[in-house]
Amino acid sequence: MIKATERILRFFLTAVGMAGFCLFLLPQTAGCTPRVVISGSMEPAVPVGSIVYTNRWIKQENIKEGDIIAYGLSGGVSVLHRVVETDKNSRIWRTKGDANEVSDPGAVSYEQYLGKMIFSLPYVGYLISVLKE
């Protein structure tokens, strides 16, 4: 009985370790950064509690209207919003959260760019938050 329980526990821990590797370490080798969504500004496209993967290797010049990007604000805060207007000459974007009624105040510069969203896993971020605690 103990050996069976031990095998199940080992299997579970191995599965959790592999899932962690696949969710966090493997994507980073391809330039992707996992981020947990904590606000509802991008709902319904990206629900609160999702994990999104952004790729910083996609160049700023290749971002177009409709793309979802992550960008940094002062104090280490990052934002994930949709590009609604692009100005390649000034090297800026206008962004807006899908759930917001108006565009974000101010422009986002190319220097603030953290990456383009590649894909998301809805609600998986809740699990990650629980495991971190």
What feature does the model see in each segment?
Residues 72-81, 107-109:
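Short coil-to-beta-strand transition motifs
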Residues 54-55, 72, 116:
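Residue-level recognition of conserved beta-strand edge/terminus positions
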